[in-house]
Amino acid sequence: MRNLVKYVGIGLLVMGLAACDDKDTNATAQGSVAESNATGNPVNLLDGKLSFSLPADMTDQSGKLGTQANNMHVWSDATGQKAVIVIMGDDPKEDLAVLAKRLEDQQRSRDPQLQVVTNKAIELKGHKMQQLDSIISAKGQTAYSSVILGNVGNQLLTMQITLPADDQQKAQTTAENIINTLVIQ
């Protein structure tokens, strides 16, 4: 459980940094339709047990963040405002809804203005998951965060998608497009 909290904390740190990097998020709004389609980069992890697709402008940043664990993978765009973090951790043997609620509480303790968009159970191609979507604010900027929790074998999958929230509908659509490509075997 400590590892999950540590990795979620790292994810929140990345999300917070993306939200407060003082860059003009309007400069990244080029190619809006192509950007929202998550068909650019196919990703396979765990010897093909986990796969998904990312927008073409997102590249693998794993190993470039200093203290990188083998079970954590990071992709981002050139600005760092869009990021996807995938963490494979030990199965905590707790219900996914309980873990998502705990994550929501941790986010709220860091950002009292946190807006929870949804915290719901979902099913992706036969696999039960929990989805926590929220909007965080830092230094006048906002970020849309979608966190997916689920079990892959005997491990806990945590996938965090962080996008600029200038256009919440676009951010939500982009996150959903990535989530809908998720395949667990």
From Swiss-Prot:
Compartments in which it is found? Cell membrane
**Similarity comment text for this entry:** Belongs to the DcrB family.
Gene symbol here is: dcrB
Lipid attachment locations (N-palmitoyl cysteine)? 20
Question: What Pfam families is this protein classified in?
Answer: DcrB (PF08786)
Q: Which InterPro entries match?
A: DcrB, DcrB/EagT6
Tell me which GO cellular component terms the UniProt record holds.
Answer: periplasmic space; plasma membrane
Any idea what this protein is called? Inner membrane lipoprotein DcrB
Main localisation, per the record? membrane
